[in-house]
């Protein structure tokens, strides 16, 4: 599975308010919050926030974690907090859905210098 981490720590469209590490579904409809929608503009996917859909379909966290391998690519300084939180917080829970990858034995995280800028290396 190839995925990324959002500015608020989301994976797929599993944002902190709606992520569920025990979701019984594989795919679910989600409402995109303002942070997630603005990121779509920041990433160049849409010209304005008004162009960004308010809802999407997303693989759930358990569906993502069921993959044998996770290849997570995280470029951009705007994602530095999410990378730091994913790797260093004591909590592995829905406050930062990307923390779920820490329990996955086949996850690899690829960062650029900008997204890794908050890490103490």
PLM regions: where:
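Conserved phosphate- and dinucleotide-binding cores of soluble alpha/beta proteins
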Residues: 1-121
């Amino acid at each position: 599975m190839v995925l990324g981490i959002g500015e608020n720590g989301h994976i797929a469209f599993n944002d902190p308010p709606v992520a569920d590490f025990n979701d019984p579904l594989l795919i679910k409809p989600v409402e995109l919050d303002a942070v997630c929608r603005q990121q779509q503009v920041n990433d160049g996917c849409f010209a304005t926030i008004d162009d960004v859909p308010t809802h999407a379909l997303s693989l759930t966290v358990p569906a993502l974690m069921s993959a044998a391998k996770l290849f997570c690519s995280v470029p951009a300084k705007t994602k530095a907090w999410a990378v730091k939180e994913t790797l260093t917080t004591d909590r592995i829970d829905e406050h930062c859905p990307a923390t779920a990858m820490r329990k996955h034995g086949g996850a690899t995280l690829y960062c650029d210098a900008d997204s890794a800028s908050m890490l103490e290396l």
